[in-house]
Structure formats: structure tokens, C-alpha cells
Amino acid sequence: MDRLARPVRTMSLTHRLATEADLPALHALMDAAIAGPLSAFLTPAQVEASRMIMGVDSQLIADRTYFLIEVDGVAAGCGGWSWRITTYGGDHTPGRQPALLTPGVDAARVRAMYTHPVFLRRGIGRMILGLCEGAARAEGYDRVELVATMGGEPLYLAAAYVEIERFEDDRGGVPVPLVRMGKLLIA
């Protein structure tokens, strides 16, 4: 039986920093997350266009700021934070800006959060946010920002993020609605 098809009764969530060896699992996890849950919020054309503006950003892995959440050795979720200007997008997304942010002046970025559809609503997103916020705070950042999909927005609102601006990204050929959100990090 496929390990993802088994019912999960009790989960033991573990986390670690992702490595290059995790790239195949990360790609599969992101593909499932984009294909599944986003379809409740976007048209099929928007879901397909999302693939152009979302995905693995290997800079986060190289910077050692990208977490992999596992359940019994299975990749269940991933996400990270960054001290770089880029707010969202994968290696293939045009317009990335690798310049560094300044703690205490700029907001750290929460980046590329995905949960496999089998593991939705089990605390994985909250766990990733906690890891990212704690790491950013430890590096001297007093606030974080992220760009949310329509599917992720409810999680971020529940975690005290506030809307900064709504916009659309049409680099995938169809406008995809997104929300820039932010949060103050309280010590």
C-alpha cells in the first residue's frame, strides 16, 4: 500500500533543514499541493499558471533556511524563510532578487510553504510558520512578510498575519490572485 494512502491516526511530526538530496521529494510535494488544494480557489488555468510562479527555490536550501516536515519519514510539508529580497517564486521564476535584507529595517520573508494534501489541517503549516518566525527573530528581524495564495490566506490570517496588498501575477499567462501579508514578531 502506498505510504501516503494509509490513514494517519497519530502523527509524529519531525522537522529538519532540507538538503539538495530532498529536491525530488520537494518537487513531488509541491506538485501535489499546487494540483490539489488550490483547485478549490482557482480556475484550472490559474492552477496551471501557478506552476510558473511557484516552486522550489534552491537558494533557500543553500542558505539553510528551508525546512522539511516529515511524518514517519514521508515528506508532509515544507517551507522556509529568507534574508533575501525575493518574496516568492521558484528557481524558474523570472525577476528573482538575491540581494540581502537588513534586520531591524526590512522584513524577513516567509517563503515557499506547501503541505501535501494528505496532511492538510494537521498543524504542519503552523509548525513551519513557528520555525520560520523563530529563526528570523533569532537573526534580528522584528517582522516578516509573505505572499499568500488564496488557499494559504486563511492559515496566515489565523496566525495573526495582516493583509498588506492584493495583486495578481500574470507571468504564467493567466492572472493568479495573491496577497502580500505581514506580521510583527514579538519577542
Regions found by a protein language model. Name each.
Residues 1-24, 186-187:
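Conserved N-terminal entry element of GNAT/NAT acetyltransferase domains
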Residues 31-56:
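Conserved GNAT-fold acetyl-CoA-binding loop/helix
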Residues 57-63:
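Short loop/turn motifs at secondary-structure junctions and domain boundaries
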Residues 65-68:
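Hydrophobic beta-strand residues of extracellular immunoglobulin-like
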Residues 70, 76-120, 135, 168-177:
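Conserved acyl-donor/pantetheine-binding loop and adjacent beta-alpha core of acyl/acetyltransferases
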Residues 119, 123-131:
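Conserved acetyl-CoA pyrophosphate-binding loop and the N-cap/start of the following alpha-helix
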Residues 142, 147-153, 159, 165-187:
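C-terminal "cap" of GNAT-fold acetyltransferases
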